[in-house]
Amino acid sequence: GYEAYIVGGCVRDELMGRTPGDYDITTSALPEQVEQCFAGERTIPTGIKHGTVTVVLDGMPLEITTYRADGEYTDHRRPDSVSFSTKLGDDLCRRDFTINAMAFSPRRGLVDMYEGRQDIARRTVRCVGEPDRRFDEDALRMLRAVRFAAVLDFDIDRDTLNALINRTGDISYVARERVFAELNKAVLAHHPQKAFRAGKRLVLAALEMPDGLPNYDDAIETMPLLPDDAALRWAALLSGAGADGAKAALTELRAPNSIIGRTCAAIANRTRNVKPEREKVLEALSELGEECLTDALTLAAAQATHAGDAARAAA
């Protein structure tokens, strides 16, 4: 007798013809009622205080969360309290972006109170309600806007972008590890340049480079010319800072040491001139190792390709 809907990113992905990474369910049932409904299955009280129970069905974990309304956000990251609700609308109105604020059930069909489906058609990331309020509640949402725009190749709505730019300083409320996680997903997107161009001020603030990053505009155009490799993409983005600057930025973001090492080595050796002679190649391999040499040459080739494209466009 309880309502239940799949909700959020999985609905967005289904509408876009993408394969969802996971499925989230929202329900009118309280956590203990969810556990009763699935008494014969494995349940995990993942975040029962905030209404979430994970149910494992056929080996697949499903997060089931009670409809809820958020209290005040005094730390600019998480609500101080949540209250359970019996209304789906209370749950949808607290979500970050319209494309993530849709719900679906076989009985009722699609519930789209904020024109999320239209924003998918418009290829737009837009906040639910007042953007300034959404970002004031949770500063991580600013980076999520850039990430979704990059991953989905969407534009950021004008009012949403203006609020994001005006609240750039609030990125300091977000843990460095979370900043890296969001930026890393954006860096690995197939078409990241448009989002990184629109969100430039926020990205530089997140990297703690408010005075700028040399060759930023060229760097973001170079990223999609590289394989889907985090170290190489970061090397393209941060090459203007040099190896030392890249190391400082990535260390501050608590990036994995493996990424920091490869990124900095690629930047440091990208200008190395290795002549196409067996002896010279073997010498470089002996000095740098296969991975480092390959990374450096791959980065240099992508940067040269972009430089050539830019020169032809300007001619």
For each feature predicted by the language model, list its residue ranges.
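Catalytic cores of the polymerase beta-like nucleotidyltransferase superfamily
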Residues: G1-A315
